[in-house]
Amino acid sequence: MILRANALLFDNDGVLVDSHAAVDKAWGILGEEFGLEGFSISNHYGTRAQDLVLKLVGEEKFEAANNRINELEQSSADETNPLPGAHELLHSLTAGIWTICTSANGNLGRARIKAAGLPLPEQFVSGDDVANGKPAPDPYLLGAKKLGFDAGDCIVFEDADAGVKAALAAGAAFVIGVSKRALETDADIVVEDLAGISFDGKQLVIPEAKILRR
């Protein structure tokens, strides 16, 4: 499959890096400490931590809970590995045609990318950089703007429902869901992983064998 666009915007966790075990553990501890009975972070992947914390504990406990989840996630940032195809694809891309738009705060996002041995883009969008996190379109609108493009010139790679909603709301040219988890989203196309995918600045080539849904 060939798709035409001028730039690529990547979510990080679940698309480029595998951090879910560390994320699940950190939020599990937070849930125990703050009495969040029955809470599972798996239902909220892709959501900015500060937004979720406020929703879960309210304003009175927000500062303590937000500081705690930041501490827990930062301490486990090195428990991160690259997902299939991420290393090869990112290292093949020239500067200025790709960036990462993560819901994580800047320090955490960069730490996970570094731990996975992946390159950092010249431009980078974290949850700290936008007024509204995913599923609002802000992260992808800003990512495209930093590269000098409209969102409609960009292809977005996402794994979580909140992120897919953000990309669609931003008006991305295509939204590619990554992993079987993305089959539950409204992504335009869903692929198994990034292995074998290539981009020359004009055309994205996806191996047919990697496509789970089109």
What is each residue range found by the language model?
Residues V15-L16, D78, W98, D128-D129, ...:
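A generic structural signal for short
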Residues I97-T99, F174:
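Proline-centered loop/turn at the N-terminus of a beta-strand
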